[in-house]
Design a protein with these regions (language model features):
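C-terminal accessory "lid"/substrate-recognition subdomains
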Residues: 115-128, 132, 149, 163-300
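P-loop (Walker A) phosphate-binding loop of NTP-binding proteins
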Residues: 12-13
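Post-Walker A alpha-helix
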Residues: 21-22, 26
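Conserved nucleotide-sensing/catalytic segment adjacent to the nucleotide-binding pocket
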Residues: 34-40, 44-109
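Conserved lysine of the Walker
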Residues: 18
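Phosphate-binding P-loop
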Residues: 1-5
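Conserved ATPase-coupling elements of RecA-like P-loop NTPase cores
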Residues: 142-147
Length: 300
């Protein structure tokens, strides 16, 4: 952890809503005049798309579980190194994973390369004179044998829907965006399950703040293609670790007054309508980030 070069980490599985948090942070950074060094979690995967398929096929042939959720498919060492070096110096290295033809064209023009979607760009230095590091991905607080990213994050945010909702989103979006059948996606869920249990879920016991979306419609059977519950058909439980609540001085009466229809379910949790999730994030996170930057300025 570092007051001079803070690390903010948002962790959650694919489709969990981390993009909503990312947008909230973007608004905060713009309003506060903050320049972040932004790092995407999938750029620290171990394999490019083709190599990942080969590694997965080899693991399946051996009867082994292998997925992007686990350590064997990721460079936790490089990510931990980035968090550590940034906290010490404000520097480090990052790269990009190319998701689309458009992204590939953008970065090929920068590097003079001919990379395709599914490949990584070369490693490059973090831009100089950034105010903080912002990570968004699967493993922002992962802890295991030989690595501990949690201890290096100054603020760790978890974004995790209730598991039936997560599966509904995964199955339905894979069908709509990739043409996968429900059965094919269920096979993926089953293959990933050991890594999900051992490497994704434990992070949410270590976060400073968790945002958990809970649907208010029937999601009893998530294993078929169906309509994804809308934000207004959901609640979001916002849980604060006691240490984080005390450290950041979370003002619950203020939040209850500002967020219509919100209520406290426990002394450390507030519940809001799903449609208010982004607004709640900005109310909660703006003073935290502001204080981080003020602390940074006080020792610079």
């Amino acid at each position: 952890m570092s007051k001079r070069h803070p690390v903010v980490s948002v962790t959650g599985s694919s489709g969990a809503g981390t993009s909503t948090v990312k947008r909230a942070f973007e608004y905060i950074f713009k309003r506060e005049g903050i320049t972040p060094a932004v790092v995407e979690g999938d750029s620290y995967h171990r394999y490019e798309r083709g190599a990942m398929k080969e590694a997965m096929a080899a693991a399946v042939a051996k009867g082994e579980n292998f997925s992007h959720f686990g350590p064997d498919a990721n460079r936790f060492d490089k990510l931990e190194q980035l968090f550590s070096i940034y906290g010490e110096t404000g520097g480090g290295e990052k790269r990009y994973y190319l998701h689309s033809v458009e992204e590939a064209a953008e970065h090929n023009s920068r590097f003079g390369t001919s990379l395709a979607p599914g490949q990584f760009t070369p490693w490059e230095p973090i831009p100089a004179e950034t105010d903080l590091l912002f990570y968004e991905g699967l493993h922002g607080g992962v802890v295991g044998e030989g690595y501990d990213l949690r201890k290096l994050a100054d603020l760790l945010i978890g974004v995790v829907p209730i598991v039936n909702l997560e599966w509904i989103q995964k199955i339905t979006r894979d069908n709509q965006e990739r043409g996968y059948s429900a059965e094919a996606t269920v096979d993926t869920i089953l293959r990933r399950m050991p890594d999900y249990i051992n490497h994704i879920c434990p992070q949410f016991s270590l976060t400073d703040i968790n945002f958990q979306r809970i649907p208010t419609v029937d999601t009893s059977n998530p294993f078929f293609i169906q309509t994804i519950p809308t934000p207004d058909e959901s609640f979001v439980i916002i849980h604060f670790r006691k240490v984080a609540r005390d450290k950041w001085g979370i003002n619950f009466p203020y939040l209850l007054d500002m967020i219509h229809g919100s209520f406290m379910s426990t002394p450390t949790s507030i519940v809001v309508n799903g449609g208010k999730m982004g607004f709640a994030m900005e109310l909660i996170l703006t003073p935290i980030i502001h204080r981080m930057i003020e602390d940074k300025k006080s020792i610079s």
